Amino acid sequence: MEIRAEEISEIIRKQIKEYGKEVEVAETGTIISVGDGIARIHGLDKAMAGELLEFPGGVSGMVLNLEEDNVGAAILGEDNENIKEGTTVKRTGRIVEVPVGEALIGRVVNAIGQPIDGKGPINTSTFGKVEVKAPGIVKRKSVHQPMQTGLKAIDAMVPVGRGQRELIIGDRQTGKTAVAIDTIINQKGGDLICIYVAIGQKRSTVAQVVSKLQEHGAMDYTIIVSASASEPAPLQFIAPYTGVTMGEYFRDNGKHALIIYDDLSKQAVAYRQLSLLLRRPPGREAYPGDVFYLHSRLLERAAKLSDDCGAGSLTALPIIETQAGDVSAYIPTNVISITDGQIYLESDLFYSGVRPAINVGLSVSRVGGSAQVKAMKQVAGTLRLNLAQYREMAAFAQFGSDLDKATQMQLARGERLVEILKQPQYRPIPNEKQVLIIFAANNGYVDDYPVASLRRYESELYSFFDGRKADILAELRDKKAIDDDLKGKIVAALDEFKKEFTA
């Protein structure tokens, strides 16, 4: 084969013409030490707090500590063999962002918004910053719309409003997650988008939650963010912020969202681990000094926005696990003081068969009263007081046998009220039916029946109204209040049902 000089020179000329000189300028640093999800990096002098860093192997990181001669960063992903001492880390100049938008609904994502459900990539071009300031005072409006949980005990006595932060607190195995999942299932057919953030949970538990939600058709309006127990502490720390960023997208677009953090005790533990590894000084129970701010800045992002800002809302139900019922520990007291009330679940009640195991005396909703449906407020006004008096009397009645008639009647009524408020899991009840059963219990319609037959009384009452008195249910649903005319109809219908029901 003959080599022709003019051809070679032509090719070289062409290549020189097409040669484009691109210089990429990036600020880089070198890893000094790495381990337990924390890297110390030298040379990133201009890095910002909370900035996204690029580690080798496509792993991201987040700047947490800015020190004189190095930067402490959390690695948002599994430590891999590419991340070691001496490797190069790049600045991005961006704060950590996660995907947001409608495309996430029905998906299961990890702590940085990447899909983990095997359904392919998430098609969204919208991203939200993980750390943003909560809405100011002017942008907010007081809570005034109800957020129905479908649980009689909560909707009647500890009502939750849209934009509220209501803590669910209790020991392990008292049904905290069950309350949250029932609330999600109850939103079916409504306008609420739900986000469930699982922090430090077993993967099998998260899979169980997903399958239950699919079974009840609730994944059609739910996003699940999972940072399981086997994932590094930085991911467990950032997962709640990822979830709230996704919820804020709906809130800021005039929609309504509900976010559940299950649970924030595990996030605090992950943050404690990060802080100690970053050599921040420990405080009470070895938590860092800013652990209060960790939760307050997260929960303050749940809000009811004013009409000028689109009137959207983000409701938060954080969960905290107590140890042996100790509500006065550090993290529980912090979160109680941040939230607008708490639902306290008690293991003694749970094991005695009262489920949901809500302790009415210690549970409170500080702002939900103004959001409660008027009809429920009318029938449940005395319920809380009656139950509290019953509990007190029942405690005294253990010591004395000679009780007068009035006390015996009050104890019998209280026993029936407790029974009426019990509810099986995954069976939320619409508000109008809750109003009916509580109205019946308060007005003595169940006093003559044995406690054991009340579960059957309740289900047959619902069937009776569904089949023959659907107009009353519709009127309750539309009016949301009981006037004299409607009260007369309900009383007549309950009298009619009483003749038919046999215990």
UniProtKB/Swiss-Prot annotation:
Known EC number(s)? 7.1.2.2
**The organism sits in which domain of life?**
Bacteria
Alphabetized PROSITE patterns for the sequence: ATPASE_ALPHA_BETA
Residues reported in the UniProt entry to bind ATP: 170-177
Tell me the compartments it is located in. Answer: Cell inner membrane
Q: Does the keyword Disulfide bond apply?
A: no
Residues the UniProt record annotates as site (Required for activity): 363
Which chemical reaction does it catalyze?
A: ATP + H2O + 4 H(+)(in) = ADP + phosphate + 5 H(+)(out)
Q: Which UniProt keywords apply?
A: ATP synthesis, ATP-binding, Cell inner membrane, Cell membrane, CF(1), Hydrogen ion transport, Ion transport, Membrane, Nucleotide-binding, Translocase, Transport
Principal place where this protein is found?
A: membrane
Q: Name one GO cellular component term.
A: proton-transporting ATP synthase complex
The record's HAMAP family line, in alphabetical order, gives: ATP_synth_alpha_bact
Q: What is the protein's known function?
A: Produces ATP from ADP in the presence of a proton gradient across the membrane. The alpha chain is a regulatory subunit.
Q: So what family is this one in? A: Belongs to the ATPase alpha/beta chains family.
The entry describes its oligomerization and partners as: F-type ATPases have 2 components, CF(1) - the catalytic core - and CF(0) - the membrane proton channel. CF(1) has five subunits: alpha(3), beta(3), gamma(1), delta(1), epsilon(1). CF(0) has three main subunits: a(1), b(2) and c(9-12). The alpha and beta chains form an alternating ring which encloses part of the gamma chain. CF(1) is attached to CF(0) by a central stalk formed by the gamma and epsilon chains, while a peripheral stalk is formed by the delta and b chains.
Protein name, entry field: ATP synthase subunit alpha
